[in-house]
A protein has these predicted regions:
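Short acidic/polar hinge/loop motifs at secondary-structure boundaries
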Residues: 1-29
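Short beta-strands and strand-coil junctions in structured, solvent-facing domains, enriched
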Residues: 2, 31-36, 53-56, 69-72, ...
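Outer-membrane beta-barrel channels and translocator barrels
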Residues: 19, 136, 147-148, 184, ...
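N-terminal periplasmic accessory domains that precede
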Residues: 35, 41-65, 139-141
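Soluble periplasmic/extracytoplasmic beta-strand elements of cell-envelope proteins
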Residues: 24-28, 45-49, 62-64, 190, ...
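Surface-exposed loop/interface segments of Gram-negative outer-membrane beta-barrel transport/assembly proteins
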Residues: 56-122, 163-170, 174-268, 288-374
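Residue-level signature of outer-membrane beta-barrel architecture
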Residues: 50, 145-147, 158, 181, ...
Length: 374
């Protein structure tokens, strides 16, 4: 069976939205959501309103910058009393902790995973020291203003992040524009657009499989192996993996993060045009046309010598999604004799969605680390 197909969490498309552009978030439930957004909102809708400029306002330039530090909050409790092996006997081929009591063999030497003679000692921080301090840098600059009949806002945000897992990073760049215009006293328009570009490298896989670095790190790392030692000894002079045991049953976590990387990149465009016309008092005609489309590429590679994929392999995904939506709403509102209020609404919705997913996999690589199909 294939033990390498671990799922990688790439988040969801809500994470593309730039928080610096958000004015408000409202949750609609029940009939109100369905009336405004149709069958797609039968279970409710989250409405995100983005920032815009103000009419009759001077031009303002706003700069925001923030830095965040991230560390692993909680790790499992590990025993540091027994060495690897079974039935109280040391065995370098076994990665579990049922070997001899470490304190009882301090005067003896044993063969480690590299074949060296060593004295056994516990390393209480060998999992903790694998992780690094993650850092995030978020910078935003926006320009906003408006005149008597128009307003505008431009914004650019960069997000650059290094993760707690060594070799992992995430970068996102978002540009947005929001502009409105009063063409006449009863005819207005607004246009908004966002472009998002993001890429990441080194996202860890999940699940009980060989591509998940937590399997060798938490389940397979004996307490007597120093994490700093395997960091320096994950690959030999011939480019082959130095596994955690001489029989090659468990990947070295540093082999996974250096050789078996998952990468992805995304380009997304969101645009809306809203026109509102009030021909007579109480009658409002609004048309909102919008599109949302993105392309995303993902790639997961396994170098030759990886446990579970000894001959190497790689897999790619090319995703494309496009949504076109148009809402036409006509409403009429009138109060009679100060006692009776009449309100009517009629609308039409056009919704079109296109989705493509191309998934290709190659195994038994002829040339190591040549991850192309041609």
């Amino acid at each position: 069976p294939d033990r390498t197909n671990g799922i990688v969490d790439v988040g969801n498309r809500a994470g593309d939205i730039n928080s610096d552009d958000i004015e408000s978030i409202n949750v609609l439930k029940g009939a109100a959501a369905t009336a405004l957004y149709g069958a797609r909102a039968k279970d409710g809708a989250i409405v995100i309103t983005t920032k815009k400029g103000k009419k009759n306002s001077p031009v303002f330039v706003t700069v925001n910058s923030s830095t965040r530090f991230e560390n692993v909050l909680k790790l499992p409790d590990f025993q540091n009393e027994y060495a690897q092996g079974s039935y109280g006997v040391y065995n370098v081929k076994m990665l579990n902790g049922w070997g001899p009591k470490i304190s009882s063999v301090q005067d003896q030497q044993f063969t480690d995973y590299k074949g060296d003679k060593v004295t056994l000692k516990a390393n209480p921080d060998n999992v903790k020291d694998f992780y690094e301090t993650g850092m995030s840098y978020i910078n935003n600059v926006s320009v906003a203003g408006g005149g008597e009949k128009a307003d505008f806002r431009l914004s650019f945000t960069s997000t650059n992040q290094t993760g707690v897992v060594p070799g992992s990073d995430y970068n996102k760049y978002a540009f947005s524009v929001n502009a409105g215009m009063n063409f006449t006293n009863n005819f207005t328009g607004r246009i908004s657009a966002q472009y998002i570009r993001s890429d990441s490298e080194g996202r860890p896989a999940q699940g009980a499989n060989d591509s998940n670095l937590l399997i060798p790190l938490i389940n397979g790392l004996p307490r007597t192996i120093d994490i700093h030692d395997i960091k320096q000894n994950w690959i030999d002079e011939n480019g082959k993996q130095i596994t955690l045991d001489p029989e090659g049953k468990s990947n070295n976590p540093y082999w996974i993060i250096n050789k078996n990387k998952f990468t992805n990149n995304l380009d997304r465009m969101i645009g809306n045009i809203t026109l509102t016309y009030k021909p007579i008092e109480g009658l409002t005609i609004t048309n909102n046309a919008g599109t949302d489309f993105y392309t995303e590429g993902r790639r997961k590679v396994y170098a030759k010598g990886t446990v579970g994929a000894l001959n190497g392999k790689f897999q790619t995904w090319n995703l494309y999604k496009r949504i076109i939506n148009n809402d036409l709403m006509v409403s009429y509102e009138k109060t009679f004799a100060n006692d009776y209020h009449f309100k009517a609404m009629i609308g039409h919705n056009l919704y079109q969605e296109e989705w493509k997913n191309e998934n290709v996999q190659a195994q038994n690589l002829v040339v190591d680390e040549l991850y192309t199909y041609t």
